[in-house]
Amino acid sequence: HITSKDYIADTLKLQQRFSRDLVLDFGGGIGTHALANAMSSKVEHVFFVDINETNRNFVEYRAKKLGVEKKLTFCKTIKDTQISKFDTIVCLDVLEHLADPASQINNFNEIMDSNSIALFNWYFYKGEENEYPFHVDDIKVVEKYCY
């Protein structure tokens, strides 16, 4: 992600503008966006959901170092958060790794209300020479997701 610094900066600015109240950070990796949201006065609490325990532990360590650990909860699944509706959902660079991204979007819809904000992106492309081998780019999956 070193080559992605401008992109990361842009997504941080975007979430700074729109994130508020109860935030779900889904698949947040090393936690840059979750930690930035935790530092925002507009955000009440961030629920960092990642299936990777190493990621969760690392972000928890970073949160403690930054003094924002009280504004974050770390969970393996959305259900573990015990929150029925989120005000903001952040899901960046995750959907292209899922076997059924359309189903995940439907799951997000269930935990949003009409005033919720969603910050999503995706990159359904394995690359010219398979540079992104873990990205889904099967045309049937992408068409189901996009249409």
Predicted regions and their residues:
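Short glycine-rich, flexible loops that bind phosphorylated cofactors or substrates
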Residues: 97-98, 127
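Conserved N-terminal segment of class I S-adenosyl-L-methionine
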Residues: 1-82, 121-122, 128-147
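Conserved beta-strand signature within the Rossmann-like core of class I S-adenosyl-L-methionine
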Residues: 115-123
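A conserved beta-strand element that flanks and buttresses the S-adenosyl-L-methionine
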Residues: 90
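A short, conserved alpha-helix within the catalytic core of class I
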Residues: 98-108
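Conserved helix-to-beta-strand junction in the class I
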Residues: 110-113
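Hydrophobic adenine-recognition pocket in adenosine-nucleotide-binding enzymes
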Residues: 94
